[in-house]
Structure formats: structure tokens, C-alpha cells
């Protein structure tokens, strides 16, 4: 009898409190980068009923209105009325931002930009798989798209009873490395008190789930759990506190690949937690796009103040067409994984980070300057050099 494996990933909406915090942190980063491309930013956010608290270290020549940025971001997410439990115009904004330690700065800054050191030690992973068109794992890809659809319908007013907070979870059945069926779907969305559970469940099924998930993967045995606890009126920061960097698996590969532990939002590109994670996604995606492997996980590590990575390693899960040593040689030849090299290679000194802070950092397109790490412009030369 053939054996199947199940794998589950989740996503959350832009109105989830942790994602609110991420978006606020990245909105502040973007505002600073519009004035000062050489700023050092590490901005953390806490949201809870009636308050937004900012903490972290920022060194910049930019002069920004932090409070206004916070309020505009909260309102833009959809929390703009007291009936929702949180109002961007009336919430308290507590600013505890300071400056970056000069001891860190001396290890990062260099007279020659090429020798810019890593902002911290750490390890980062990048991953790609040919199981979806965007070379992402199917469970997280579909979970993100469910949340994007919820947001689109809410913002367009097509389902006017939708509120900003929501979560989705998708379980895929795999035959080897190939997803063959959706085993279970969980979707919970905040809503106005006026909507009945029966009407909500029907609308979510017809307008979100069936519009997003491939019909060929749904079957008679697929299980659906739509707002399984019943009412979900109280949500956002009223229901739960939110913190920057608490959705690192949602932000990346839904658990399908390993994670080095560092979060992304609120960090400028000198922080390799963010920039190097983007870089190794770029590496892995181009390797898979080139047909060198069907699945590829790349790990890179750094020492604080040192430009060159302390290690580069890969796992192709037995799907490689050339040896792993040959693949690593190609990586070293075609990708500059020093911090400054990454920033230049991916054009990361751009105010484009807020759009990455919800619905995942990978497998997406955005503005012209965003998601440069999703390009497959190295695939052709990698394939040629691999002799494929």
C-alpha cells in the first residue's frame, strides 16, 4: 500500500496583532530609508489594547514623525474605529527608541563598503521547491493566498462584515515530494457581530476557499474548519498582544525548511538576519529554477564584524543533478554573500519593506523595487555552468 505524508503550514492576516507589529516596525524603517539610506535601524513594536510601544536602536540623520507613521499604519491595516477595539487615531504611542551601540557600529562600518562586516553572528536558511509555480512549499503558499483573499474582500467591501484579524492553516497530502491532495483547511476570521455563523461559513467557503485552492487538490474527504470556535468578534490587539518577530515561520517556509531564529521586520539590510535570509532564498530559488535540484535548502552563517560568511552549506534532499560540492562552488562563483554584496546584488537599500511584512516574505511580487530575491535571473548561467 502506498504511503502518504501530511504536512501543515499556517498564515495570518495583516490584522493579526503580531503582523501589525511587524508592519509598524517596517513602516518606520521605510520612512527612515526615504531620507537616509545609510541608517542603522532595529525597531521593535508591541501592540496591546489602546497602546503601541516602540523600542530598539536607530542611528540616522532622518527626521521622521514616528507617532504619525504608527497611526497611519494602524489605520491602514483597518483598525480605525473604537467599535473594532483599537483605533489608530486614539491609541497611545510610547516611543522608547534609542541609538545603536557604538561597539556594534565599529564592527559593521568600514571605510571600504565592500568590507562591511555582518551586523551580528548568526545562521540563516533559504529554501525552494519546484512543487509550486513560485517555487515555494504548497502548504504555506496556499495559506498565504487564503489570507490575501480575505484581505482583498474586506478592503473591497464585498464581505462587509469581515474584520482585519484572521488565520489560515492548510494540510497537504504528499506522494513523495509531490502534493497530491488537500487534507484539511482551517480558516478563522474576525467578523462583525451581525453575521450568523451559517452565513459566514458559506461565504468563506464560496468566496475565499473555493476561489483560492486548486479544485484538483480538493476532494470529498477534505475537511474544512471555518471559525470552528464559533464567534470571533474580539480580535486584533484586544484579543492578544502582538510583537515584532513572533511569526518567523509564517514569514518564511511554513516549517518546511529550517530557520536560523532571526526575525526580519524593523531591520535594515546591515542585519544579516534579514538580508542574508533573502539572499539564500535567492540562491535556492535560482538553483531550483535552473533544474540543478528539485528541492534546495541553503544555510549561511556569519561572525559579527566579519564580511565573509563563516560557512555555506546545502541540502538537496537527494534531488540534485550534480554533486553538492559542485553546487556550492557555483554559489561561491555567482553570488556575493558578503553583507555589502547582498545589499548591492538585491538592491536592498530601498523603502520597500512594509509590503513584505504581511502574507510572507517569499514567493511573492510587489512594487518594482520589492522582492528582488524572487528573481530567477541567475538560472540560465547556473544551468550552463552545471552542464545541464
Curated annotation (Swiss-Prot):
UniProt xrefs under Gene3D superfamilies: 3.30.300.10
Catalytic activity as recorded in UniProt: L-methionine + ATP + H2O = S-adenosyl-L-methionine + phosphate + diphosphate
Cofactor: Mg(2+); K(+)
Pathway membership, UniProt: Amino-acid biosynthesis; S-adenosyl-L-methionine biosynthesis; S-adenosyl-L-methionine from L-methionine: step 1/1
CDD domains, A to Z: S-AdoMet_synt
Residues that hold L-methionine according to the record: 57, 100, 240, 271
Pfam families assigned to the protein according to its UniProt record, in alphabetical order: S-AdoMet_synt_C, S-AdoMet_synt_M, S-AdoMet_synt_N
Cofactor binding, per record: Binds 2 divalent ions per subunit.
Listed EC numbers: 2.5.1.6
Record's function text: Catalyzes the formation of S-adenosylmethionine (AdoMet) from methionine and ATP. The overall synthetic reaction is composed of two sequential steps, AdoMet formation and the subsequent tripolyphosphate hydrolysis which occurs prior to release of AdoMet from the enzyme.
Family as reported in the entry's similarity comment: Belongs to the AdoMet synthase family.
Protein's name in the database: S-adenosylmethionine synthase
Source organism of the structure: Psychrobacter cryohalolentis (strain ATCC BAA-1226 / DSM 17306 / VKM B-2378 / K5)
